[in-house]
Amino acid sequence: MAEDAHTEDLSTQTPQQEGLPERLRVHSLARVLGTTSRRVLDALAEFDGRQRSAHSTVDKADAERVRAALTESPAAETPPEEAPAAETPVADLVVVQAEQVEVVTVSEAGPAEPAEPAEPEAPAAEAEAEAETEVADEAETPEPTFRGAVLVGDEPESRLILEHANIPPARETQTERPDYLPLFVAPQPVSFEPAVVDDEDEDDDTETGAESDFDSGADSDSDDDQADRPRRRRRGRRGRGRGRGEQNDDATSDADTDSTEDQTDGDEQESGEDSDDSGDEDSTTTEGGTRRRRRRRRRKSGSGDSDDAVSPDDPPNTVVHERAPRTERSDKSDDSEIQGISGSTRLEAKRQRRRDGRDAGRRRPPILSEAEFLARREAVERTMIVRDKVRTEPPHEGARYTQIAVLEDGVVVEHFVTSAASASLVGNIYLGIVQNVLPSMEAAFVDIGRGRNGVLYAGEVNWEAAGLGGQNRKIEQALKPGDYVVVQVSKDPVGHKGARLTTQVSLAGRYLVYVPGASSTGISRKLPDTERQRLKEILREVVPSDAGVIIRTASEGVKEEDIRSDVERLQKRWSEIEAKAAEVTEKKAGAAVALYEEPDVLVKVIRDLFNEDFSSLIVSGDEAWNTINSYVEAVAPDLMPRLTKYEPAGPDAPDVFAVHRIDEQLAKAMDRKVWLPSGGTLVIDRTEAMTVVDVNTGKFTGSGGNLEQTVTRNNLEAAEEIVRQLRLRDIGGIVVIDFIDMVLESNRDLVLRRLTEALARDRTRHQVSEVTSLGLVQLTRKRLGTGLVEAFSTACTHCGGRGIVLHGDPIDSASSNGGRKSDSSGGGGSGGGRRGKRGKKGAARTEEVHVAKVPDHTPGEHPMFKAMAAANGKHEGDEDHEDHEDHETAEDTTAAEVRDDTRDEHDADERAHVVTAAVGAAGDEDLDDSDEDSDLDSDEESDDESDEDEIELDDDEDELDEDIEVIGDSDDSDDSDDSDEDDDSDDSDDDSDEDEDSDSDEDEEPVREVYEPPVTAPRARVRRRAAARPAGPPSHD
């Protein structure tokens, strides 16, 4: 439309110019004429009676008429005493406007200069108030309300008037509206101090774009008109300083124009009465846009404003905190450089972990009440079984070792093995020799006489003993190469990592742990509150001042004399260790010495684990019985009734592990894949960095409900089994668990809570971390000793433990899979279900040339060929003498009609006869048995590769998990959707295929009776035609 056309708002045309534009808007015409939009609208209404708005478009003729009418009107209405002002032409006023624009343009580049006062025009403004009030009362033409400020030379005109005019002091508010008001006289003059125009004003106004210029220009006269009314405060201007006025004008120009285009004159009067409130509201809603513009200006300039500088966008008394740029903050180094910390990195890491734990809301486990403590103890029946066994493999053939198994409700949850080869070093105390100190690693390597050096980190150094309690704690200041240092092994060597050492020595007893040099005591939170209070009173009298203790759970109900004797025994042992270390240090023998070694694993497990929680302790073997019996009688005679010695019924009777089915459970624990009772699976992989557990549904398809319920049940079952596997395999370090994705947050919390409750039975130190963004559960666990797999396995000498075979040439995975399946199907017909049948089909086609022992059927006996011969006018007996190519021509004419119906039947017949001949030559094996064997083989392959019915929802529903190997498989992709039930039903009929139905199976029976041929040598050309599957008589192989 014409009114939507964008016109130049910043027009500087004056009446001195020869002509007006062909088309222009009302507000632009009012600006050119130096009057208000209301007067222009009134003049236009007098001409034709039409109702217009400030955005209406007028042509040149109407504009000339309005200019003529408005030029004559002021001269006629001006009083005689104001004749000098009336004689002043309007053109002069416009010239002054143009000059004023030039002054503003210059002032933007430099400091603002006060303009000439506009006092001569003030009386004219007072005189015109009465006339314009009368016109405003009579006029009822609708006119939308326009807010904002017109931009002349990138500045609002109203701002130019206030900033560049020496305005007289404020006077009483006028009660009458002036009839005519020149553009450059402030309707409500206020005292104002000129402010320095910042360079950011240009950016602020420029960023608003052409639309902001258009809207603000259209609203200038409307603002002037509203400002003439009594008690009207100009939004963002009066009494609020330049800063807030600029903010309101700039921020509201875009929003107000769009929201007020369709309002009427009555709306304008209502908005005029509420202008104060609306102005404040608009400034609040658009404050975010102003802040964004400030940020853009900072990014353009490259640096922010100083704290002392006042931003023009902020109101007075506003405290602005601006973040200093990174370039100013990092004076010493650049962002690309690596930053360091003062002091020990490992000590800082400890402090950071504590802070992160507090920030994350992690709390210590709650102290149990006595009822909860007894309920937890009685909830599970625990049994400990010990077996002595003789080695049967070199190099220590004939040696004895001891196995210890802990059962909870008949299920093995922990396993320990003790032997000379797998002896644990944890707890041993050595007088080591420092080999080298690495300040950059904050670690020292110490020779402890075990072949491989142990590592001592800065976080494990006893700084008080080293004399660096209050100084800068650096490991190079505490240790030097060649120094003797008393260290204790805190972690066994694993893989290529040496033993972990610490100088904070602790001695474990039956009821407590003695810590020399410590000053604090600790009590296990697994004890009830009443027992903790009793033990605290005992420790105040028992513990010496130069040591600390940690109470174990085994001290529950123990008398004060037993605890005192335990403390005195451990204190005496520490005195002996110190004396021996001082003696060796004085001699300077130059070799590491073992100061104290922990007892045998058997004694350690009995000391640490066997308490009132166990209902019985069953021991098999004389040597183990003597050791356990003597130790328990010495330290815990109240537990003697729970000891039982196992005596086999005869020499061939099963041992104690076989009776409790422990060997069977240990054998399953050696596997990589663990089957859940419901059919789900766990895949446990151990790497150098962490242990990863993957949860799969396996053959678990649910027992009702939707997919979310099925997945949650599988995850709940997996959470308990994962904790059991961690304890049984003694997996330590970082453990990451990939549960199947659940949609509901409540189900995720339920699984995590079940995992935490199961870990409460684990006596080792563990911590469940947060769930990652990918849905992985992280936890850490302290290793007790040698793991189950590590104790009974060694790395493969061929592949180095990687489990792969390397070749010199690249291996084609497709050909290798196809060869494996064809070999297995040829040997025993492996591959259950449809996969097995397709494999057998391929094998039959490959071996058809070698097995060809079945003679070709006489074509004339087939009913279809009889009909073909009759149609061609030939005799049945003449068909044998015809050339083979004539047969192919006749067959091709009918192949398109019957090939789709008989293709599967012929294929099934061929496979049946070929397999029959092959089996007869091999020994007349049963086809059903071969199918069952192939089904078993396929199940074994699916364990290693994929399950056809396995549901995997781990990372994304649209992505294929590695457990569903559809891509790259030798079979068709649609077989992956087949279930085991379908495979079992298909195995009962070896001739069925996924495209066949019961009707096709019924049709196969009479065909087999018709095609029983005598065993003769087949023709080679017919064999080639049968391989190509023509629509003709099938070849009976």
Curated annotation (Swiss-Prot):
PANTHER family membership: RIBONUCLEASE (PTHR30001), RIBONUCLEASE G (PTHR30001:SF0)
Family: Belongs to the RNase E/G family.
Quaternary assembly: Assembles into a homotetramer formed by a dimer of dimers. Interacts with DNA-binding protein HhupB.
Coiled-coil region(s): 561-589
Note on cofactor: Binds 1 Mg(2+) ion per subunit. Binds 2 Zn(2+) ions per homotetramer. Zinc ions are bound between subunits.
Species assigned in the record: Mycolicibacterium smegmatis (strain ATCC 700084 / mc(2)155) (Mycobacterium smegmatis)
Lineage: Bacteria, Bacillati, Actinomycetota, Actinomycetes, Mycobacteriales
Protein name stated in the entry: Ribonuclease E
UniProt biased composition (Acidic residues): 127-141, 196-226, 248-284, 879-891, 923-1006
